[in-house]
Amino acid sequence: MRIRTSASTSNLGPGFDCLGLSLNIYNIFDVHLSDTDILFNIDDAYNNDDNLFIQAYRKGINCIGIQDHISVSFYCDVPVARGLGSSSTLIVGGLTAASALHGNALSKQEIFQLASEMEGHPDNAAPCVFGGFCASFSEKNNKYITRSLSFSDNLKMSVFIPDFEVKTETARAILPESYSRNVAVNNEAKAIMMVNALQNGDIDLLKECAIDEIHEPYRRTLIDEYERVKEIYQKDTEGVLLISGSGSTLIGLSDRYISDEASKAIMNLNHNWQKRDVKVESLGVVVINEQ
């Protein structure tokens, strides 16, 4: 059985922990039932019981009421610890494998709930499961709610991926414990307007509401050359550059792609920045073939 999951960018400026967008960068997993858990084509650091795919698979089969083992071959294109939802690709992949190998015992909604529980927030899990542009939130009883939103075809997106990681734990630890009412209200209003801008491809509105006050002012200090990349991108495209998830990847949105000259200027900086033009992945997690 082959399962495909997609990268995602979350937050999208002021939509902290609630907005997420699925991107056409993929991880693929070939999964089969086995006598023991065996992992192929994966770094030694992840070839153990802490592997998120295996953890998610076990969580899934526990919910179904089955105990068994799998062999998994990993073909991964989503970079780790770069703010592109790599953990969600593994978790959603493992849960989907548990479901698909046992008669599709879990619905996509159940997979989303379980994945969000494992992540602790739903902003990457939702687009990874359902695809497209999603808004999500959690209730106090750990019930997660998500809805799919439209996303403008007029927006052109590029991700800029450096050669260093930013761990989610580090990116969360740097944030304040509390915010003033004024900051909270302003950011909430911007998040609402951000959805409108992304749905309608409104670049002028996008520029106004993309200035986040909750996480970006703090997390950008963890991303060396952030200001330089932002300067080059915005001067060339007149768009906006945002931190993807917790970083270190940055994502640019405009009505046109960045020029080759500006791309080279970014790639020639100190951190071996890689530029990839990306599009929205609308399908979410896919079981490509069943055996």
PLM region spans:
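Active-site rim beta-loop-alpha module in soluble metabolic enzymes
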Residues: 159-221
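DPxDG-like acidic metal-binding loop motif
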Residues: 84-108, 129-134
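ATP-binding N-lobe of GHMP and related small-molecule kinases
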Residues: 1-82, 96, 100, 104-106, ...
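Short beta-strand-to-loop capping motifs
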Residues: 33, 138, 162, 252-256
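Glycine-rich, charge-dense phosphate/pyrophosphate-binding loop(s)
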Residues: 12, 198-291
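Glycine-rich beta-alpha junction loops
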Residues: 7, 25, 132, 161-166, ...
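Alpha/beta catalytic cores of group-transfer enzymes, especially the acyltransferase/condensing modules
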Residues: 106-155, 241
